[in-house]
Amino acid sequence: VTESAKRRMFSIIYGVSYPVRIIVVPSLDLATDITSKLNGGASFKSTAIEYSIDSSGDQGGSVNPINAADPVWPSAIRDVLPNLIIDEISTPILVDDRWVIIQITGAPIISDVPYEDVEPEMFRFSKLAQERFLMEQLSSSLIEKHTLTIFDDGVKRALRSLSNNPK
């Protein structure tokens, strides 16, 4: 495990996070219309409830704070966060086949945990992440190269999700 891997893990866990609301819609036209409404004073929360196709829509677009280093969130979203100010509405952001609108709802959350205090933990987490990545690579490779007969439904579902194969 490299020092940079440990530092990256530290950034993911303890790095700057941004409290946000999001709206996810299926088209640029709708995203543009919604952005205009929001910039005209419409409530982000009410608009998210009305239009968002994301599961957060029911909560007015409220999601857990987004860490700018967390790869769970697409880089297109993470890259915008440091450039927005509180209550500012982002321009529509394309993520896969959907459009996302973001509003920063509060000041960035900055951890006061020193790296040195958690370095052993970062080593362990980094090692686990690397092992998981390598196991997923191996699993995908084996699935592609070999025909398997699997009798356990849980294993079938897990492997199907790895291979993106609906069979």
Give residue spans per PLM region.
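Peptidyl-prolyl cis-trans isomerase
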Residues: 34-76, 94-95, 105-117, 145, ...
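Extracytoplasmic
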Residues: 15-20, 29-31, 58-60, 88, ...
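FKBP-type peptidyl-prolyl cis-trans isomerase
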Residues: 22-27, 47-51, 91-110, 121-122, ...
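Soluble non-cytosolic domains of exported or imported proteins
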Residues: 1-4, 17, 24-29, 38-42, ...
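Cell-wall glycan
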Residues: 11-14, 21, 67-86, 167
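Acidic/polar surface patches and capping/hinge elements
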Residues: 1-19, 49-50
